[in-house]
Every structure is written in C-alpha cells, then in structure tokens.
Amino acid sequence: MSGRLVLVLGDQLDRASAAFDGFDRGRDRVWMAEVAGESTHVWSHKARIAVFLSGMRHFRTALRHERIDVDYTALAATPAPGEPPSLAEALAASLAEAKRRGIEPDALVVVEPGEWRVRQALSAAAEQARVPLEIRPDRHFFSSVEDFATHAAGRKQLRLEYFYRSLRERHGVLLDDGEPAGGQWNYDVENRGAFPKTGPGRLPAPVRFEPDAITREVIDLVNVRFAGHPGSLDAFDWPVTPADARAALDDFLVHRLADFGRYQDAIWTGAPWLYHARLAQALNMKLLDPRDVVAGAERLYRAGKVPLEAAEGFIRQVIGWREYVRGVYWHFMPEYEHRNALTADRPLPSFYWTADTEMNCLRDALSQTLRHGYAHHIQRLMVTGLFALLSGVRPQDVHRWYLAVYVDAVEWVELPNTLGMSQFADGGVMASKPYCASGAYLDRMSNACRGCRFNPKVAVGADACPFTTLYWDFLARHEKLLKTNPRMGMQLKNLARKDAAELRQIRRQADGLRDAAG
C-alpha cells in the first residue's frame, strides 16, 4: 500500500486546495492526466485546449520543484497506441498499473470537480477499482454547495440579490458598521453607460503573457493534434501560472477597474477587452483566489482610487454571480442540463463557428471569439446569446457552443449562465425575465449598427435588422407564457400596438431568417 493518490484536475490548479491537506510527501502522490476526450466532448477552441494543458504542465512542474511525486500523463501530437480517451479510463489504467506493481493507493482524494459528468466518471472509476474516493469541499469559493442548498430551502423563487447580500454580510465585504457601503447594496443602475459617439478613446491594453517554453510546446501540440478545431492560437497570451494571474489582477485593478462599472454593459466593435477584467479564466482554473480579487477591489475603493459603483459592480460579479451560478448548477443538476422552457428546437446557426454573417455586432463578437477564445459578458448575453434566444435555438446546442469556445468555460459556471441567464431555458430560476431585446438595444449600447447594412429600427423588408424582426416574433410566439411575468408588461404592451397584418409579415420574415441561418 502506498498512501493516497491525490487527483488534480485541469480546473483545480490551486496549491492551497483542500486536496493537499495532510499530504505526506513520503507516501502520497499526485495524479494528473491530459486526455483528448476533455477537448473533444465539445468541439473545443484551440485556445481553450492550450490554456488548460499549459496550466496543468506548469502546475506539475511547480509540484515537482517541491519534490512532490506527480504521476502525469501527457498528450502527444500523435495519439499513442492504447491512449485512454477519457479521464475515467486514464484513471482506471493508472490504478490497474499501480495494482500490478504493488503500489495501489489506500485511497483517492479529489476536490469537488467542476462538472457533474466528471464527478460521476471519477466515482465510477474508483468504485470499479475498489479504491475509496474522498471528495473534499472546494474552499476556493466563498460559499459551499450546502450553503446554497440551505439558502434555497423553502424559497419559491431564487434570486441573486439575496444570496449576494448574505455573502457580503458573512464575509464583511463593502460594509460600514454592518451596513452596505454608501447605503445601497447594488449600484447596477449607475453601471449601464454607453460610450459617446466618438468611442471609448484610448483604452489601456491588458498585460500580455508571452508564451514560455512550456506554453510554446503546448501550442505546437494543439496546432497538430487538434488542427481541425475552431479558433486560432496566433494571439494566445493567457495567464497560465499563479504569478501570471496575480499580475493580470494587479493590471486590471490599477488600469481598468475605475471605468469598469460605468461601461460594463457597453460594446465597441474592434475593442474586445474595453475595461473588462479578463480574470474569469484564471479564477476558474483556480490560479487566482477570489478573496484576493475582492479584497483588491475594495482596497482601491477605500483608498479613494475607484468609485464605489465600479468596486461594487465588479465585486458583485465575483462574490455574487460567480457563487450564485455555482449554487444553481449543483442544486439542480443533473436534470438542469435538459431544461427547455421555451421548447426551442432550431439548430445553432453554422456562422457561429465561422463569423460569416452580415450582422456587424455578431460578426465582431464571433470573430474575436474565434481569435481569442473570449468575448465579454454583455457580448455573450446580448449579442450571441440574444440572437440564439430570439432564433429559437436548442438551448443544449447553445450550451455546448459556449462550453467549447471560451477559455474560461467550465460547466458549473457556463451552463447556468447559458441555459438560465441567456436562453431562459430554466423558466426563470436564474433570471427573473428573458433577456430579450431588439436591434434598438444594440444601437443604443454599441457602435455596431453604424455602417451595418441592416436598420435596427425596421422589422420587415430587405433592410430590416434580424434582431428586430426576431424580437417581435419572439414576443408574439411566447406571449401566453410571457404574460404571466410582470416584468414583461411594457414589452408586451408595445407588442399589442402591432396589428395582425404586421405580425404576419414579421412571422414570415422571421421564419425566413431562421431557415436561412439553419
């Protein structure tokens, strides 16, 4: 018997993880495995594959520098004979080899995985090998799965705001004598600014992380092994170590946080980063502690260097939304993944993989997604997500696309944001109303409509904006369901002003758009 085998997954690159509690260098070992199946179960963007592989290899190297025994399985550019295709099969093969050599572990230890699928697969592999599996709580987060279950118990509706407030109170974040700083919990109303017609002006460029030898090796591997996958690695510059992640955090706090709040919902074509943090990938791989992120933002507010609405708006993303979506995921899985409250049944438009569309806003968001593996949250919600919602795309197709193309995508955070917030497929668990809007919203919040061949104010005809056409048709199709939602009252009143003939024209044009996109 040889002690415990600590399993470290690609989104668990945290040396302070509970997985290492009581770790005995003389007896225990770490197990890590690169498997093709984690990149192919959804058609993953090359940058998403590379960032996880590079992060894992850097973490392996750091552990070995501490003289920790790491059993590491690496992918090669050419599949090796007998290569295990999945994480569970890789673990089973390692356990079988350990048993053959007489070094079978006493137990397996892992921190809560970020996917239901992975948790089930590891549990099954351990059971088959007859080795005990200890799943430890993930203390990376401000709250536990059990905390959320307690919060949800007995509530008819779940809403972020109440959970967010409870976490701020529990952890003493942005409080003055027990009350919210500034007298309000939420400054969202002050964080909805659009850029002037002249644009955002000179934007601070985020710090770049030039690929080192390990990352260059990974890039070469991905370009060969996953050549047919979407996206590009030409601009790869993501943080892959804790030091990188800390530098990315410091860069954001100093150069962009002050303007983040006011412009967090704004869009400007050709400017993928604007004032956004670019920290989700580092956080979701556990290269960065969210407590450091929140504390850094509050420290700058207390020092008078950033306005309260900017600090609060950003902190809400971390201690609010991030914690809340994780709670929703584990509370409702595995059934949650299959929800489809609007019975949407269209396939995802093929141009989501190519950016080949005449709509400026979509072309811009999709092009930067394919180049960087990134789009900021308002592009995901109100451009790519909105078009899929209005088009009636199957929410599971949308989910698989988001999981595949973004470097920060881990299922616990991506799935509720997609099915719930973006596609309203959960019927109102995540969001109190569908996030539906016409081209007029995009015209107000971006410059994308300028020079676009479509007119955001027109719903019918050759120049009609597809968003506007599909918006009115969406309201008409789902009017019966939406009438039960008091927050949809104003939009449905506007729908009622349209006569039957106009709605028939809109329906015909919307059907044509859907058929052409499919």
Predicted segments with their positions:
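N-terminal Rossmann-like or analogous alpha/beta NTP/dinucleotide-binding catalytic cores
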Residues: S44-A98, A107, E112-G114, R155
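C-terminal catalytic domain of photolyase/cryptochrome flavoproteins
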Residues: L9, A16, D21, A266, ...
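Short, solvent-exposed loop/turn segments at secondary-structure junctions
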Residues: Q12-D14, G37, E115-W116, H140-F141, ...
